[in-house]
Amino acid sequence: MHLQLKSHMTISAPAEKVWCILAHDFSTIGQWASAIPASQAVPDLSAPSGAQVGGRVCTTAVRGFADVQETFTSYDEPSMRFAYQATEGRPWFLKHAENHWAVHSLGPHTSLVEVQAEIDMNLFPGLFLAPLLKLQMGRVGAQTLEELKYYAERDQVHPRKLKAQQKQVQKEAPVRARH
């Protein structure tokens, strides 16, 4: 069973700046995206030509996903396009999950970001979960683009990310107090 989700966002920032956030700083998505409490580079993956890293591990705030390793499948610096797939940490019912990103210049201070997610699921329980997964992934994708826009345009994280960070600190505080 195959799902495809597409989205786009116009951002009032130069394409080069947005590309830097998405591609050059690929491993630091956890600094600005609320669905990703933390992220880091995978040091033992070789980086494609032009990329800083070969992949990242993201701790997610999305139910059903634990730490997900994402590995570049393509990277094209001149055309500002890349794709990556979740290679580890996917829920058992997902056979394949891949995202394609492209950044286009619409002028010196405006860019367009396009995202396409491709997901292949097992027929069971995919048939039943597909509508919920599509809804959840669509919502998370829209929020991530909104947070990217905010981050690129204002050089600061979205209030939703700040709130998520505060929740994470509060969640960890009782654990630290017990030790």
What function would you assign to each model-found segment?
Residues 1-3, 64, 95, 109:
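Residue-level preference for beta-strand/loop junctions
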Residues 1-48, 174-179:
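Hydrophobic ligand-binding cavity/cleft-lining segments
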Residues 7-9, 68-74, 97-105:
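Hydrophobic/aromatic beta-strand elements that line small-molecule binding cavities or substrate pockets
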Residues 12-16, 76, 106-108:
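Short loop segments at secondary-structure junctions
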Residues 30, 40-92, 112, 143-166, ...:
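Glycine-rich portal/gate segments that line the openings of hydrophobic small-molecule binding cavities
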Residues 35-43, 59, 96, 103-104:
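Hydrophobic, well-ordered secondary-structure segments
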Residues 86-143, 150, 159:
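Beta-strand/loop substructures that line and gate deep hydrophobic ligand-binding cavities in soluble
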